[in-house]
């Protein structure tokens, strides 16, 4: 299948023209060097872009602007940001049970964090577009082209499957649209009921080896819910939840094809350019070159943007990202996602925060405790230890508390499945256990139990 519309490509309707200024900025951005891009035929990719330019978007401007408003609250210390989901989504796992399980886990974490923080938790999933991954090498250990995500090539260790195929751009769109549709349905129906989600958390406390530690907090949430019921509180917010969609803006052929110009009447009287493949997009550690296409592309779009900052980030470089990506000092526009590693975060993060805070910009500070703590197990699996993940979050909180700044959120790779990919946690997963259910298409994820355990631990940090 090469497209999802029944009109020949040469008859597809053109997009509304951009203003001269926007067109110039976009063309300039796309002309810059872009790393980590597929090596497919440019003409074939252009044909697929033409298809994607005509399809309904995955998100709409009003939703994106609503998220930006909620993120402004995070930037101002009035809310907390929880972002999580699969490291890499796959077409084969884009199923109702898998999506439901991931959404359920994110909702369970959010309830615990909301109570711990005593403030709203903004929920953003890695969903409906996380189909591409940067890789450290173009070739894998078998001499095949590296798997770069289902948007680009296949996972099977086969030369034909590993060829970069631009028709996968449209398959990615079709899968993203289906996932987004299901997520909207699930979160507006009974799955998001606060009482139901808390009952799942009670089950976790009852069955987890570490449950006794979290019994008191779960009991407090129980009493709070009982109090609201006794008072007759029946707000719609207790039955539904809003979860926004995010992915790494990596494959520029996909992102540029999903650009749409807003109706000025919908966006404060000004036509804005949105990447409507998602609500929120981030730039990865490997693609954040200041002179590169990814940063320049992010400058042009009106979506909220994140930037991953690893241990090589200097305070001066962080300030440059802030000035480039948040030129109007708009709270909610920019999230700085730090991924330093648990043994470096306490040393490297303070000068970065101090330098950025001195600019007066209100950015969101978010901790990614996953990517700086990856290692190879004795059994040959890429893994992460739960204790190191928790320690990086703890270090992140310690730094912010010392500086008087707001630890704005966490960004984690999780799944609603009972996989064995990360070591430790209350289940005490060991190197020899990893082979049992090691199912990730890329990096190791926290399973449901580990995700909830992390949420309870972060809730304790939020209360301290």
From Swiss-Prot:
The keyword Aminoacyl-tRNA synthetase does not apply. It catalyses: D-erythrose 4-phosphate + phosphoenolpyruvate + H2O = 7-phospho-2-dehydro-3-deoxy-D-arabino-heptonate + phosphate. Its EC number is 2.5.1.54. GO terms for molecular function: 3-deoxy-7-phosphoheptulonate synthase activity; manganese ion binding. Signal peptide: none annotated. Phosphoenolpyruvate binds at residues 126, 285-286, 308, 339. Its cofactor is Mn(2+); Co(2+); Cd(2+). GO terms for biological process: amino acid biosynthetic process; aromatic amino acid family biosynthetic process; chorismate biosynthetic process. Pathway: Metabolic intermediate biosynthesis; chorismate biosynthesis; chorismate from D-erythrose 4-phosphate and phosphoenolpyruvate: step 1/7. One of its GO terms (cellular component) is plasma membrane. Keywords: Amino-acid biosynthesis, Aromatic amino acid biosynthesis, Cadmium, Cobalt, Manganese, Metal-binding, Transferase. Pfam families: DAHP_synth_2. Mn(2+) binds at residues 87, 371, 413, 443. Binds 1 divalent cation per subunit. The enzyme is active with manganese, cobalt or cadmium ions. Homodimer. Probably interacts with MSMEG_5536. Catalyzes an aldol-like condensation reaction between phosphoenolpyruvate (PEP) and D-erythrose 4-phosphate (E4P) to generate 3-deoxy-D-arabino-heptulosonate 7-phosphate (DAH7P) and inorganic phosphate. Belongs to the class-II DAHP synthase family. This is Phospho-2-dehydro-3-deoxyheptonate aldolase AroG. It comes from Mycolicibacterium smegmatis (strain ATCC 700084 / mc(2)155) (Mycobacterium smegmatis). The lineage of its organism: Bacteria, Bacillati, Actinomycetota, Actinomycetes, Mycobacteriales. The gene is aroG.
